[in-house]
């Protein structure tokens, strides 16, 4: 396997959801729907371990861009040569600020000053869990990813989560289908669409969609995402109006999010086909916390996403938080260069 030589940056946004000033500003701009759902805005106090994992398991990273509304963790070492502190106003156009929508933060990432063409986007709940190499994210200058296809299934409505993220990803797919033909993409690079990186059901799904002009849907993989900055700029060039409409102060159910970049990379064959099967995504709950701790201890999965859940009560959350902190402290006991 040839070694990847391009510079690779990491980007991770973060907000101190327990900051009274942030909560006050949020409620000022949204008085009709103030913060009441703690499941959406809990601070588990484990973010420092994200950086310890990066130093231990991805020491090759070029730069780490920490994106916030201007408030940074008090323990962050601003003098760290690998760390770049980015405020929303440093790259997001003023007309979109202040913003409380992750979509606005994500859709403008190409404007982050100094960001490399090749970067990996993390949410602050996505942790590297074992040694990774540049080739886990990019090969031949292309993002490693698995274009596992599926037929679109209508999401079910939930009174708390409403329509969820699937409606937004439906919008992402619709935009991609406006600009690309599935038939043309497969003809251009058939091994991208029928290669050994696809497992049984996914390979069968690709066969079932043979000859279709439009893409149906791609399996949702909630983990860190390798991206090309040039693809983000291309989407802005092609769909400026819709991208601007998606950069709202608060998340809208009908809008685009960063998955449009992933789908665009697939449709334009700008990806390196990979299995990407060593990733885990688990909801944070009292019933799942021991499973999470086992994954952390075993270190078999290369990364793990710890999804917040609105169904986790405050009492349960305290128990989960204590157990998580114990597990992370045991796995990463030493401070990283990113900490004071």
Q: What is each stretch, according to the model?
A:
Residues 1-120, 127-340:
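ER/Golgi luminal nucleotide-sugar-dependent glycosyltransferases, focusing on the catalytic module
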């Amino acid at each position: 396997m040839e070694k990847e030589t391009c510079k690779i940056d990491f980007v991770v946004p973060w907000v101190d959801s327990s900051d009274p000033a942030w909560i006050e500003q949020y409620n000022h701009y949204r008085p009709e729907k103030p913060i009441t759902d703690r499941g959406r805005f809990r601070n588990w106090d484990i973010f420092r371990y994200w950086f310890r994992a990066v130093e231990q398991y991805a020491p090759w990273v070029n730069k780490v861009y920490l994106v916030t509304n201007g408030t940074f963790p008090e323990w962050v070492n601003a003098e760290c040569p690998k760390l770049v502190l980015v405020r929303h106003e440093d790259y997001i156009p003023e007309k979109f600020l202040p913003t409380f929508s992750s979509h606005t933060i994500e859709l403008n990432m190409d404007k982050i000053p100094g960001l490399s063409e090749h970067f990996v986007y993390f949410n602050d709940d996505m942790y590297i869990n074992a040694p990774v190499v540049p080739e886990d994210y990019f090969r031949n200058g292309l993002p490693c990813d698995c274009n596992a296809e599926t037929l679109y299934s209508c999401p079910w409505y939930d009174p708390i989560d409403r329509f969820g993220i699937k409606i937004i990803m439906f919008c992402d797919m619709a935009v991609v289908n406006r600009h690309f033909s599935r038939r043309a993409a497969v003809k251009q690079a058939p091994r991208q669409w029928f290669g050994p990186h696809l497992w049984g059901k996914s390979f069968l799904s690709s066969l079932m969609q043979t000859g279709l002009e439009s893409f149906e849907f791609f399996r949702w993989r909630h983990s860190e995402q390798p991206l090309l900055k040039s693809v983000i700029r291309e989407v802005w060039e092609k769909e400026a109006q819709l991208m601007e409409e998606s950069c709202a102060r608060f998340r809208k159910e009908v809008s685009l999010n960063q998955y449009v970049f992933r789908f665009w990379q697939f449709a334009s064959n700008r990806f390196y086909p990979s299995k990407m099967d060593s990733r885990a995504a688990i909801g944070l709950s009292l019933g799942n916390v021991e499973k999470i701790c086992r994954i952390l201890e075993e270190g078999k999965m290369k990364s793990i996403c710890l999804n917040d859940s609105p169904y986790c009560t405050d009492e349960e959350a305290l128990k989960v938080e204590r157990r998580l902190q114990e597990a992370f402290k045991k796995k990463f006991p030493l401070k990283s260069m990113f900490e004071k």
